[in-house]
Amino acid sequence: PYTTLFRSAMRSFILGGKFSMASLSLKNVCKVYPNGFVAVKDFNLEIADQEFIIFVGPSGCGKSTTLRMIAGLEEISSGELWIGDKLVNDVEPKDRDIAMVFQNYALYPHMSVYDNMAFGLKLRKVPKAEIDKSVHEAAKILDIEHLLDRKPKALSGGQRQRVAMGRAIVRSPKVFLMDEPLSNLDAKLRVQMRVEISKLHKRLQTTIIYVTHDQTEAMTLGTRIVVLKDGIIQQVDTPQNLYNTPNNIFVAGFIGSPQMNLIDATVAQEGSQVTLKMSDDVIIKLPAEKSKKLIDGGYVGKTVVVGIRPEDVKDDPEFIAAHADSKFVSTIRVYELLGAEVNLHYEIGDVTCTAKVNPRTTARPGDEVTFAMDVTRLHVFDKETDRKSTRLTPVTYTSRMPSSA
């Protein structure tokens, strides 16, 4: 039954349809399977016309399921899906004016590139001259004009993906849905295709919803990113805000490479100053303004989760002198040279942490090295709240823009 539904829906995509607007609205959308498994829970999101929205999260988080519900490949269990001013829960995929690009290219092997791109238009009985114009325009955009006479077997992976995108472009849809389109490509091609997709969005000025598990794709492509875990939205924000002001511990650890260092710490008060004890040897003093926030929040004597990005921990003497209240000593366990930077792995208590430092560092495994943290870039998460729900209330020192999550 699912295979039949899938094939029927894919045929509907090829036949196409039209809408006057490309904005989307998902209101309390849920997906529950017959066995009771909840794949997507209470999904609320407003997508503006011409936005490039990324759904990102680990495997099984519900991102592809949500995309398939938007496409019409999956039935919505409850909630509402609007495209423009029309409720489309029960609208056939062909009438949603949506084009989808999959992880596998799904090209017809016996057809040329031209015929693969033109196939959907031929089914819709579009005049031949219009088909020819649309195919050549899309091929020019994607730089595959010289490939139009070739068969898919004669193409590279990147070229096949361009053809798959071209097949979607010729339909002039209002919304593109892309389900991990680059995951079958090697690392070099992924970088190239990321650039091509970004250019494509700017040129076409259409709405794109893009699913990936790769945070690099998410951060480099999206105007906004939806971070998902266990079918629940964790945060919706711009790439910069996600990185600088994560909404909870999951987002803090998921976004960023190397990931944010997350360490349990006890909050103590000495007069008007607060200290964060991360281990017997690592105690960080906070300035008055930051201390007051934790005191007023009732965190003195409690255990919190402290987050600090690897690039905000340095072994540079000048940096250490400027951040003397946050300096500490640790033994280097692993040294990773990455060309323009070095990752030093060390420990705070029983937690392995990372510092992203200048490649001219002299630190090597086994060395005891003095580090310091930039406390203005420190995040403090409420561990008690973490135990009560999957959504944490952050006590963070940097301002956070409103999130729709």
Predicted feature residues:
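Glycine/charge-rich catalytic "coupling/switch" loops of P-loop NTPases
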Residues: Q273-I332, T362-R391
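Short, small-residue-biased leader/transition segments that mark boundaries at the very start
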Residues: P1-L5, L392-T396, P402
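The feature captures the beta-strand-to-loop junction immediately N-terminal to the Walker
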Residues: V56-P58
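ATP-binding/catalytic-site motifs of ATP-hydrolyzing domains
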Residues: E80, K86-L87, I232
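ABC ATPase nucleotide-binding domains
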Residues: P93-F254
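Helix-to-loop junction immediately C-terminal to a conserved catalytic motif
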Residues: A71
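Short coil-to-beta microelement around the adenine-binding A-loop and adjacent beta1/P-loop entry
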Residues: G36-V38
